[in-house]
Amino acid sequence: DYDSKNHTTREAVLHQQAEKLAELKASGRDVMIRQGNDYAAVQATLITDMDFDGGQYSIIDEYVPFYPLALHSRVSYTGASLNLADDAEEVLLRSAEVGAGLQYTLTAQSARVLQDSTYSEFYGADASLVLDDITAQVAQYRQALSGIFNQEMTGHERVGNVTITTYANGTRVYV
């Protein structure tokens, strides 16, 4: 809130938030953030809805997963919720490319009540309809990518339409 008697700069708020996140981490608590800024990422245990591109720049013709390269094995991260994504296959493949965990958004009650509401984007979140498929998808994903989640990402290259991500243990993931 704006308070004309007590101004707080963005820089001061940044430092306050960074201090609080550091305190939480130092106390042994897990810290989950959504997207997050650079100062928050270093204190996080999990980053959800991470932008794998690290921002869009019109002068760059090719995508380089800078944030995943910098953070992999140091912080766990996910992309968008697969069951709510416009293109779930694209999110799944990009997640595999950058060694991300999978994220889903679920409701315990029927999502039909959301159909004509301002929360209609959660219509695909009905756990009773998707939980079995999600369980199978997560098991397959974990099996396919076992051994990379705790490994530093050491390389990322594009060969034609295929990306190759290399990890410290020598594992290569082709997408």
Residue ranges with predicted function:
Residues 3-175:
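Active-site-proximal substrate-binding groove within the catalytic cores of carbohydrate-active enzymes
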